């Protein structure tokens, strides 16, 4: 049932940006940070970052407000192969307003489906977002 719960639509401009981001040719880390526009009941672009490490990205996320992130990460595998997985990270810090938490939680599935992402992770504190954490999460996807 939770799959059908949609609180906010995805902004059409954001949909197009996510589509282009998916097919980007650059080989550095990059991120799209999104938020819920409560008045418009819509997920919108907040900011875009190029050449940003997980540690730098962590500093850009609010500590007390939820955010959605699509992160293109240069992942060097143990055998030397390089891939560029697109990761969806739901930052849902402890201490957010329940109403805000519900809006984000209810909008997450629609956004993941819209962006066609399979690597979906959640953090409860921005401190969790580190390169070691991301590599550990990605190690489950061979």
From Swiss-Prot:
Keyword annotations: Acetylation, Growth factor
Pfam families: Cofilin_ADF
GO cellular component: cortical actin cytoskeleton
Upper taxonomic lineage: Eukaryota, Metazoa, Chordata, Craniata, Vertebrata
Name of the molecule in the record: Glia maturation factor gamma
N-acetylserine modification, residue list: 2
Domain ADF-H, residue spans: 4-139
InterPro entries, per the entry: ADF-H, ADF-H/Gelsolin-like_dom_sf, GMF
Species the sequence originates in: Bos taurus (Bovine)
Superkingdom of the source species: Eukaryota
Coiled coil regions in record: none
Any one Gene Ontology molecular-function term assigned to this protein's record: actin binding
Signal peptide as annotated in the record: none
PANTHER family tied to this protein: GLIA MATURATION FACTOR GAMMA, GLIAL FACTOR NATURATION FACTOR
GO biological process terms, semicolon-separated: actin filament debranching; negative regulation of Arp2/3 complex-mediated actin nucleation
Family membership noted in the UniProt record: Belongs to the actin-binding proteins ADF family. GMF subfamily.
